[in-house]
Amino acid sequence: DFWSFFHSRLYHVVLLTLLSLLQLSNGIVRLLGRRTNPSLIFASSFLIFILIGAALLMLPRATYHGISFIDALFTATSAICVTGLVSVDVSSTFTSEGLFIIIMLIQIGGLGVMTLTSFFAMFFMGNTSLYNQLVVRDMVSSQSFSSPLSTLLYILGFTLVIEAAGMGVIFLSIHGTMGMDIEEELAFSAFHSISAFCNAGFSTLYGNLGNELVLHNHNLLYITISFLVILGGIGFPILVNLYETVSYESKRLYHRYVKKNKRTIRKIHLYNLNTRIVLIMTAILLVTGTVAIVVFEWNHAFAGMTVTEKWVQGFFNATCPRTAGFSSVGMTTFSVQTLLLMVVLMMIGGGTQSTAGGVKVNVFAVVMLNLRAILIGADKVNIFNRELSHDSIRRSN
């Protein structure tokens, strides 16, 4: 019944987790109030969560046959830092409790320890000092002086909505095809949706997403995971900017065509320069990478696949090297040309303030524009009829 829930293990786990986050948030707020270096707090918070995660993964219920401290530490570090590297086979080593610990570490790492703890501090403890709010505003790349809490809510809201939508589509794509019951399918869908959006690349399948259970006739699964990786890799400021633009355009169209009032909302351009650069560069890298990989691997690594599967695998393998660690084809089966292309894609990475790595597409775009300006002898670096500041160019170089 209802009251029995308060005596269940799940209730105690959730309660202890919330209390731990509140205590950590309170500690971070006190440190910020002392003008402590936010970068030092950021690094220390990651280290604390890594050590806690490693300790939890060594618990008897987290694994089937036990795990060494080095393997637990490596797995926890990889999960928090969303790299996707593992020293043990995830599917045969960790129990459902262990997988839950891993996915929570991935979620914390994907959102950012500081983002998560700052949200708890502001939401449950009220407004903090102006200095603390400015630090948080800078941390989440908010351009306005409105409450950082609203920006943090945007980030958490976007994360939950996108991951829930991804979970639903993944569930539909695998339902009744992998020999799992409903609970296992839901757990599989939730794990891979979070892992994809956070760009972690962890999978519960042996051999990652190259497992024979999903390699063929699961194009929707690969496409869904690819788009989750892309959304997580473009960065939260881009997602917020896109939301604001879509919200504005929806209101404008509503007033114009439903209320027949053309003067109510004036049309303006809300896409900022950063959003345009990231979206255009992402599209260029995806299209170029997909076409190149399909051409290189048509009769090589993709031999035996249908035409549709080849293009889906090309898109998937052009998406994941930049930001995530998923794999659907063994790396040893790829041609040298594809491996070199993947090295370049990994180096470029995703957008700033995202879950992706690399030098970032923003930086890569500025470097290329600066190089072009030098080659043609231009005094200024322009893009979309706007001049890039010398400070932006200096930091990118």
Segment roles from a protein language model:
Residues 1-397:
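Membrane-proximal intracellular helices of multi-pass ion channels
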